[in-house]
Amino acid sequence: WIMGHMVNAVPQIDQFVNLGSNALEMDVTFNKDAMPVYTYHGTPCDCLRDCLRWEHFPVFLQELRKATSPGDAKYHEKLVLLLFDLKTGKINNNQANTAGQNVAKQLLQHYWNYGNNGGRAYVILSIPYVEHYELIRGFRETLKKEGHENLMEKVGYDFSGRHKLDTVREAYKKAGVDGHVWQSDGITNCLPLVDDLPRVREAVRNRDSPDGFINKVYYWTVDKVATTKKALGAGVDGVMTNHPDVIVNVLNESGYNDKYRLATYDDNPWETFRN
């Protein structure tokens, strides 16, 4: 999976997919009532990027729906995964459940269209704090209550903070999650390349072990050829990037093109491939 990073304005959807992304990451900002209101990152962000691009969350979801609905004029067949980076830093722990309910309602209305010819992409809810595990509960309970429990098949989860993996496992247990787990790790592209992969390798070991809880591992932010090769060498399933074309070129190189291919809609993002 080549995950286009910080796609928060509508024109960036086409831009990143045309450069080679089959997955997109959006930053979702909440107001004080735990309502998701904007796709927006803000400063600081990755080097050489405009941190201030934004859109109203419902509008952005509607555009994502068009981009992932077969038959729509804006449809991109290869766009198969959407990762919502939920910026929950401003909400407290006892609002997390409400935040999850609100995200579910917005997705249900504006992306899934209440199950009536909605967007078909898989969705990952990425949460920065394990303390906010109730967000997952609120999300799942809302889909159930609204009669769309079947859509949970389309949803996966990621705790994106740098927590110990045991702590992450515990949070999933509390959230009632078993499976559909992506684990991320990374470092901003502004910092010189340090070997930041020990935690990635630990996550890959967990994924590859019979009693692991992780299904997929991705690394961010991968913008250079050397970093791409390092991440692939560590065994990741996906990379998040500001430059999808760089990753595409590496995957087309000999030595890589016989080992890797871009994920399509037929590839289940919750299925584990062990090294």
Curated annotation (Swiss-Prot):
| SS bond partners | C45-C51, C47-C190
Endoplasmic reticulum: is it a keyword of this entry?
Answer: no
**What GO terms are given for molecular function?**
lyase activity; metal ion binding; phosphoric diester hydrolase activity; toxin activity
Keyword annotations for this protein, in alphabetical order, are: Cytolysis, Dermonecrotic toxin, Disulfide bond, Glycoprotein, Hemolysis, Lipid degradation, Lipid metabolism, Lyase, Magnesium, Metal-binding, Secreted, Toxin
Give the family this protein belongs to, as stated in its UniProt record.
Belongs to the arthropod phospholipase D family. Class II subfamily.
SUPFAM superfamilies for the chain: PLC-like phosphodiesterases
Q: Which residues are glycosylated?
A: N252
UniProt organism field: Loxosceles arizonica
Cofactor, how bound (note) = Binds 1 Mg(2+) ion per subunit.
The UniProt annotation places Mg(2+) binding at E25, D27, D85
Protein name per its UniProtKB record? Dermonecrotic toxin LarSicTox-alphaIII1
One GO biological process this protein is involved in is: killing of cells of another organism
Cellular location of this protein?
A: Secreted
State the active site: H5, H41 (nucleophile)
* Cofactor entry: Mg(2+)
Q: What is its main location?
A: secreted
